[in-house]
Amino acid sequence: RIIENFMTEIKRKGSRSTKDIPKDILEQLNSGQIETANLIEWLAVDQKLLLENLLKQTDRIKYLSPILSNIENLKKQTVNTINEVIGTEILNQVTKNNDFDFLEIISKHKSDLIRCWATYTIGKNPKLNVKEMLEKIQAFSADKHFGVREICWLAVRPTIAKNLIKSLEILSKWTNKEDENIRRFASEATRPRGVWCEHIEELKLKPELGLIILNPLKSDKSKYVQDSVGNWLNDASKTQPEFVNSLCEKWKAESPTKETAYIIKKAMRTIDKERK
């Protein structure tokens, strides 16, 4: 699914394996001149080199050493953990140096990975309350690059989980936004189990809390949104199958559309599998 999303939305065709990435393309990726075209390229970018190039280009090379030290201290270095550490330490450096202009630079950068770092400068900012944090992350939820959209909900999910009721209330208003990416964020960021992230235990036990987001999206025209809503309910079905079964029956009666039928099929896949 991730690869498909990357492949369909970036015009330049990406390589099918790391070894096939042309040298000049890799150099442009590592210097922040172009966006990644698919997941293969996204994983191939040397984030430490990209960071060094960014800091040289913007005359902020003094930030490099403390950020690299934090990366070296990671127990496990993955694309996501390095992403998070760089974003968090950039926030620390700009705060210490009163250099908030740098946040504007990285938020609008050509490189999708640099924009990913920017999402963590929001998600890791202790001075922001949940309302302010979600307001700031909304622009990233509408980013044209799938990678940024995926990382932005990861960056704020811990705060969403800690302020669940307030977050659900705020995100429920995103379900009527014109941009399908913003609508999808409301669902994806609150999935009970989610991907690459900690579960939200309260939603695993009480998925009905999510109805404020799910109900408005039950017949959304966007497949991107439909997939997320279906996955949300499939998550919930692993701990509260009765709730999901009952809701799907209700939606089937209330909303006999092909969009709702698609969501229901996706939502019921674990339950249906266990019935066989």
Regions found by a protein language model. Name each.
Residues I2-K276:
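Surface-facing alpha-helical segments and adjacent helix-coil boundary elements at the starts of domains
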